[in-house]
C-alpha cells in the first residue's frame, strides 16, 4: 500500500479491479481546504484515459510492475514481437498495447516494456528518436504570414510538421511524447 503522495508518472495503480497507469499528476494545495492530487490516468487494458482526483494522504494500492529492456524485432499482423536482451526470450505484444509507439519504432530498436504478472502493460520509448524523412514537398519561401512548416513522412509512415528547409532523406530528431520535430541530425 502506498499513499497518494507517492504518485508519479509511470506509477501503476489498482483501482476497482483494474490497472491504471499514471500519465500526468499534480499535487495541489489550495489556500483553503485540504490538499489533493489531480491525475490523468490510462486504463492499461482498454486504453481509456480518465481524470481522477484523490485526497492527499489517501491510501491506494499500487501494482508491482517489472520494467525490462527489449529489442523490437518485427510486426506479425496486428501484433509486435520483441526480444528480451538479457535471456533472449521473445514475447508478442498486441498492437493495442503498443499503441502510438508504432509511429516511432524501427526494427532492432531498444524499448522498455512494463510487465505485470507476465502481461505486457505498455511500452516506454526513449524521449526522442532519430528517424529519416522519406517524403516531403519542396519548401517554398514567401507565400506565408508566419514561420513556415510543411508535412513530412517519416520512415515509419508517421507524418510530422517540419521547417521548410528540411528535405527528403534527412535524418531528424523527433519527440516521442508528442511527435514534434526537434531538429536535424548530422551523420
Swiss-Prot record:
Major localization class: cytoplasm
Gene: efp
This protein's pathway: Protein biosynthesis; polypeptide chain elongation
NCBIfam families associated with the record: efp (TIGR00038), PRK00529.1 (NF001810)
An example Gene Ontology molecular-function term: translation elongation factor activity
Keywords, in A-Z order: Cytoplasm, Elongation factor, Protein biosynthesis
Family of this protein: Belongs to the elongation factor P family.
Organism placement in taxonomy: Bacteria, Bacillati, Actinomycetota, Actinomycetes, Micrococcales
Cellular component GO terms held in the UniProt record: cytoplasm
Keyword Zinc annotated: no
InterPro entries: Elong-fact-P_C (IPR015365), NA-bd_OB-fold (IPR012340), Rib_uL2_dom2 (IPR014722), Transl_elong_fac_P/YeiP (IPR020599), Transl_elong_KOW-like (IPR013185), Transl_elong_P/YeiP_cen (IPR001059), Transl_elongation_fac_P (IPR011768), Translation_prot_SH3-like_sf (IPR008991)
Function: Involved in peptide bond synthesis. Stimulates efficient translation and peptide-bond synthesis on native or reconstituted 70S ribosomes in vitro. Probably functions indirectly by altering the affinity of the ribosome for aminoacyl-tRNA, thus increasing their reactivity as acceptors for peptidyl transferase.
Subcellular compartments: Cytoplasm
HAMAP family on file: EF_P (MF_00141)
Protein name: Elongation factor P
Record bears the keyword Protein biosynthesis: yes
BP GO annotations: peptide biosynthetic process
PANTHER family referenced in this protein's UniProt entry, alphabetically: ELONGATION FACTOR P, ELONGATION FACTOR P (EF-P) FAMILY PROTEIN
Pfam family, any one: EFP_N
Domain of life per record: Bacteria
Amino acid at each position: 500500500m502506498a499513499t497518494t503522495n507517492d504518485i508519479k508518472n509511470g506509477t501503476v495503480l489498482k483501482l476497482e479491479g483494474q490497472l491504471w497507469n499514471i500519465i500526468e499528476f499534480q499535487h495541489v494545495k489550495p489556500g483553503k481546504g485540504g490538499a489533493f492530487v489531480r491525475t490523468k490516468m490510462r486504463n492499461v487494458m482498454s486504453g481509456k484515459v480518465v481524470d481522477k482526483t484523490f485526497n492527499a494522504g489517501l491510501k491506494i494500492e499500487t501494482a508491482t510492475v517489472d520494467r525490462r529492456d527489449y529489442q523490437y524485432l518485427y510486426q506479425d499482423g496486428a501484433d509486435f514481437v520483441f526480444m528480451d536482451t538479457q535471456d533472449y526470450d521473445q514475447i508478442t505484444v498486441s498492437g493495442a498495447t503498443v499503441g502510438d509507439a508504432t509511429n516511432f519504432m524501427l526494427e532492432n530498436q531498444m524499448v522498455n516494456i512494463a510487465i505485470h504478472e507476465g502481461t505486457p502493460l505498455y511500452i516506454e520509448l526513449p524521449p526522442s528518436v532519430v528517424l529519416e524523412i522519406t517524403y516531403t514537398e519542396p519548401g517554398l519561401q514567401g507565400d506565408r504570414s508566419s514561420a513556415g512548416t510543411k508535412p513530412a513522412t517519416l520512415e515509419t509512415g508517421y507524418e510530422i510538421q517540419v521547417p521548410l528547409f528540411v528535405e527528403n532523406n534527412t535524418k531528424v530528431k523527433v519527440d516521442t511524447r508528442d511527435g514534434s520535430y526537434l531538429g536535424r541530425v548530422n551523420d
